Each structure stands twice: as C-alpha cells, then as structure tokens.
Amino acid sequence: GDLTLFTEEISDLELSKMTNSELRLLRNMIYAKYGHKFNSEDLNQLYSNFNWYNPNKKVSDSQLTKVEFDLVKRITIFETRQETEPSIKFGKEIIGIWHITPIMPSTWLDRFVISSDNKIEFLIDNFQKNPKISEYLGHYEIKGNTLIFYVEKLITKKETIELKEIQLLKFPITPVSEVTLMNGELTRKRIQIGSHEYFLFFGNPRI
C-alpha cells in the first residue's frame, strides 16, 4: 500500500520478480489511489486497509499521468505470462546479443546475451552511473510464452556474488521476427522480452 512506489520508474527486472496476482494488485493500485471503486470486491476490501483509499468514482485511463498509464500498459504485458500454454520454440535464431535499441549509441544500453547452451545474461545500460548490480548471469528455459531466467550470479562494481538460492525472473517473450527500419535502410531481427523490444547484435557485449 506504499504509494511512493510510483514516484520512481519500476523496471522490468522488478516486474519480472512478481507473480501475475501481485501484478494485478500493483496495476489496480494505480487506479485505487485516485479513488476508483472496483467491481471486484477483493480489490475494494484490500485497498480499504489503507487510509489513503477513498472509493468514490470510476477512474478512466485519461485521468492517469503518462508515467502511470505507461506502467499500466507494461504491467498488463507481464500479466500475459502463461507457463502452461504450449511453449514457444526457439532455434539458433535466439542466440546473440539482444539490445534495447536497433541502433547502438556510443556504448551498449540494456541487453540480454543468450548463448547456445541455455546460458543467459542481462547487462545494465553502460550509461548508468554506479548501478547496484551491473550484470545478472544464469540459465533459462521457455515455458509457454514465458522466459524463466534462473539467476545464479550477480556482478557489482566490486565483486561477483554467487547466489546461495537461485533468483527467478519471469518475462513474457515473443517469437523472433524481422523489422525494417529507416525507410528500408536497416533490417534487424527483433524479439520482445518483458515490456520492451530488443534487437539482435553480435560482438563483445561488455565493450
């Protein structure tokens, strides 16, 4: 019930740690803070535990800030995770560096590195100054439309941390497709992991 959650950007990494039920509560909390009265009684009862909740109207998307509306859309994407569906099949097309922009600036931004032996890494934007964690390393599997990232190691500026208990990150994922950009001048392989699109690159992901 802490409304300060919404004062800073909530990353895909944070959303990936939450269950679909937790995501539903987080998404609806955005409407609850404006006094939205829900049709679902469990939501009304839950938010009634907080003194800031004053249900007196129906709140529409147009009443949200752009940051709040974008977060609702991103949470909704994560809520599409279905591990019990037939699994998306990937071959060699998933191997490589998946970068969050189709054109790389002067250095790498957020990227996933996926290897042929089911190893996976997530490396944080090089422009970020002193992130607490700069790299997540482990292995992955695909269940339904969900990439399950079993994090085994964390890398900080000072050390590599071997986790005693594996940390699970769960991202919705789409099949690989091809996109043409810049009026046909650039073609990239594209995949959606979490709420963002990533584009295929090769090379050294740590330069």
Identify what each model region corresponds to.
Residues 15-22, 67, 90, 132:
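Extracytoplasmic/periplasmic, Sec-exported soluble proteins
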Residues 38-83:
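Compact alpha-helical subdomains of small soluble proteins
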Residues 14-55:
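Amphipathic alpha-helical packing elements
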Residues 84-137, 141, 148-207:
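Lipid interaction determinants
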Residues 2-12, 30, 55-57:
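Acidic/histidine-rich, surface-exposed loop or edge segments in extracytoplasmic proteins
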Residues 1-10, 81-94:
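N-terminal low-complexity, Pro/Thr/Ser-rich intrinsically disordered segments
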